[in-house]
């Protein structure tokens, strides 16, 4: 379910929240007036959106975007940028906004896959929704209304995303993801059919399933997570799903299988509520000082306007390397205090970074220092 590599694994991309998938066999959206409310979430906040955009979302109010909770899990809200109506990621970034706060839906949890319970990339999820509050309203793009009742089995829905294509090409090849916004057409399934096709662990209350059963079926792949699914009601689109997980939970990543969408309709009142339980928001990144043969990490202060104080804070260290323009963090074993011997940091490739995680009832964030060269 992760955008680049497993968050829980030995190597994690700074840009990766929890899970993130993308579309196979979708069709390009040619009409510039269609789906202008699609959001693209860039947790890195720097560089080409084609390279660093990781998840989708939907503008449901002038100042708020709905996405998947796993897209913002363990991400630094202070670095994140949200792009509305980015039609072509490489050259049309759309309307850009910063983040003034994030709230994860209470009860959000990952559900281990029966295929491999220890592989977090195969997890399904429950209550996989989050709201991103924008630093400034978006007033020139119509919002996407949230539906009022879950579509019945057999209802057609359309899914809009910029995810990976599933083609067997390298990360550096532009064919690996959909630069242009794509659409996939699915049909809503019953819960029983979804469980039969995916896993016994599908939460009916918070997950709606759909599948494309055509001869050339559209399916999810990496970087589609959080992207919106809509149905037409009285001639207008309404949000009925937020992409959460797909065939990867049964070992069919980027392949034809039922698709699990978090149900925003079930939590409509929460989405448009006061959202007081904001996740922690670092006022700045941690800072690393080099003193003799050791490194010391100064923890960040916390912005109490854009977030609530954390209930727990932990410190770790990692070596940072790069996959293209995406940073990859390899944790340094046993490094769980603010001080680190340089000799320990120099055992693996890459510069050393301090990683601070903080959590409260609104969610979990992770903020990372600038790198320090430990191999000179």
List the predicted regions and their residue ranges:
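Chymotrypsin/trypsin-fold serine protease catalytic domain
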Residues: 96-97, 125-215, 264-268, 366-371
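Ser/Thr/Pro/Gly-rich low-complexity disordered regions
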Residues: 276-376
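Extracellular Ig-like/FN3 beta-sandwich strand-entry sites
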Residues: 77, 154, 349-353
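Protease-domain processing segments flanking chymotrypsin-fold serine proteases, especially trypsin-like
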Residues: 1-66, 74-75, 79-84, 100-102, ...
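Active-site-proximal beta-strands of protease catalytic cores
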Residues: 64-69, 154-168, 211, 230-251, ...
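Acidic glycine-/aspartate-rich tracts in secreted/extracellular proteins
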Residues: 44-46, 70-74, 85-90, 135-139, ...
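C-terminal subregion of chymotrypsin/trypsin-like serine protease catalytic domains
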Residues: 23, 39, 53-54, 58-72, ...
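Conserved catalytic-core segment of clan PA serine endopeptidases
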Residues: 24-33, 81-139, 192-193, 199-200
């Amino acid at each position: 379910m992760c955008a680049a590599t497993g968050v829980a694994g030995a190597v994690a991309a700074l840009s990766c929240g929890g899970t993130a998938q993308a579309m196979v066999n979708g069709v390009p959206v040619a009409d510039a007036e269609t789906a202008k409310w699609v959001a693209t979430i860039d947790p890195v906040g720097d560089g080409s959106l084609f390279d660093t955009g990781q998840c989708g979302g939907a503008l449901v109010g002038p100042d708020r975007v709905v996405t998947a909770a796993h897209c913002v899990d363990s991400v630094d809200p202070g670095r994140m940028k949200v792009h509305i109506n980015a039609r072509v990621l490489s050259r049309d970034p759309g309307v850009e906004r910063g983040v003034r706060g994030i709230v994860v839906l209470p009860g959000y949890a990952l559900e281990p896959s029966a295929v491999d319970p220890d592989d977090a990339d195969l997890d399904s999820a429950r209550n996989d929704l989050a709201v991103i509050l924008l630093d400034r309203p978006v007033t020139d793009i119509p919002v996407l209304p949230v539906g009022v009742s879950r579509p019945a089995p057999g209802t057609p829905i359309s899914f809009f995303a910029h995810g990976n294509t599933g083609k067997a090409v390298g990360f550096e090849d532009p064919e690996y993801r959909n630069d242009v916004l794509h659409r996939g057409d699915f049909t809503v399934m019953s819960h029983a059919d979804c469980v039969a096709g995916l896993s016994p662990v599908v939460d009916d209350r918070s997950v709606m399933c759909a599948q494309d059963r055509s001869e050339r079926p559209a399916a999810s792949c990496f970087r589609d997570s959080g992207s919106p699914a809509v149905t037409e009601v009285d001639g207008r689109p309404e949000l009925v799903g937020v992409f959460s997980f797909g065939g990867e939970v049964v070992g069919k990543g980027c392949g034809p299988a039922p698709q699990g969408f978090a149900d925003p309709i079930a939590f409509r009142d929460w989405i448009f509520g006061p959202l007081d339980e904001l996740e922690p928001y670092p006022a700045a990144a941690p800072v690393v000082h080099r003193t003799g043969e050791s490194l010391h990490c100064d923890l960040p202060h916390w912005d109490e306007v854009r977030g609530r104080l954390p209930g727990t804070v932990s410190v770790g260290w990692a070596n940072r390397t790069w996959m293209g323009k995406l940073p990859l963090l390899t944790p340094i074993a046993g490094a769980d205090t603010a001080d680190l011997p340089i000799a320990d940091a120099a055992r693996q490739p890459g510069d050393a970074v301090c990683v601070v995680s903080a959590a409260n009832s609104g969610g979990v964030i992770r903020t990372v220092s600038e790198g320090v060269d430990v191999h000179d």
